[in-house]
Amino acid sequence: MIELKYLSKTFQMKDGAVKALQNINLTIPDGAIYGIIGMSGAGKSTLVRCINLLERPTEGSVVIDGTAMETLNAAQLRERRRDITMIFQQFNLLMQRTCLKNVCFPMELAGVKKAEAEKRAMELLEMVGDALKAVGMYEFREHAPHLLSGGQKQRIAIARALATNPKVLLCDEATSALDPNTTHSILTLIKDINRKLGITVVVITHQMSVVEEICDSVAILDGGVVVEQGSVQEIFANPKTAAAKRLVAPNGGSAARDLSCFAPDDHVVRVTFNGSSTAKPLVASLAAEKGILVSVLSADTRDLSGQCYGSMLLKLPAELAVAQQAVEYMRSQSGVTVEEVTGI
């Protein structure tokens, strides 16, 4: 288990102190795939570097399996870091080494014999192959990394990260440099590794689609502060903070923030659907049963762990009484949440 307790990080700059992280409290269970999401500058990369103490927290504690990491001496910390590996946006492969030797590298540092290291590296290269294309990465074992595609490089990086049998895999924007299809294949691989090996995965990203596809739970970071956390389904169904709404419903969220796009007497609401309620023809039912017509400004649906979730931004009639009646009707429907954006 990973526990971040009252963690803060301050950088001393020429112009003064910069608070990158403030009072972070998170618990990540063993075997989970946990997302940490935020816009650029939110403090995501600083936070993930604090987990393995590449950055030492200014205040607070990082506790992994009951051990406060900041209390370890240099030798103890090096030993514990073998249990915590990391993959990056730019892969960080050693270009002067072949793919096989890249995977062997952390085992060399750990003193593993060459024959044993190469045997495990070959097994890992097979494991991270692209099942959809029936391509085992061992076929590229003698290739230099510059001959590989971005997705292939990331597969080699994942194999290298698994070389020391880690308990935790940190993914820092690991798919942000990849195209959508390759992103999906890499996320599928990470999910398979999590399921087969039981490795705890921490995913740092600015892409809600990544969290949606792979994560069990998520924390939303904004300005160095965790503003919201919970299950992915919970956050998608009912985002409470402005930061969460920007990430979960970027179209509806941006329209809702720009109040200048609405007239003073406009009545606009955000409607979210949870699970089976997405199949209900809410707008049509509102018109048929109440005779109230509304305009759909934006709409979106997502499938999360087999459950369908959706959201709509609706413009209601100008008459206040009619708009209020529409809100009351929608709120009476099971699995439907209505948030007033403006004008009611």
Identify the meaning behind each predicted range.
Residues 112, 137, 199, 244, ...:
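Hydrophobic patch in the ABC ATPase nucleotide-binding domain
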Residues 237-266, 270, 290-293:
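C-terminal boundary and immediately downstream tail of ABC-type ATPase nucleotide-binding domains
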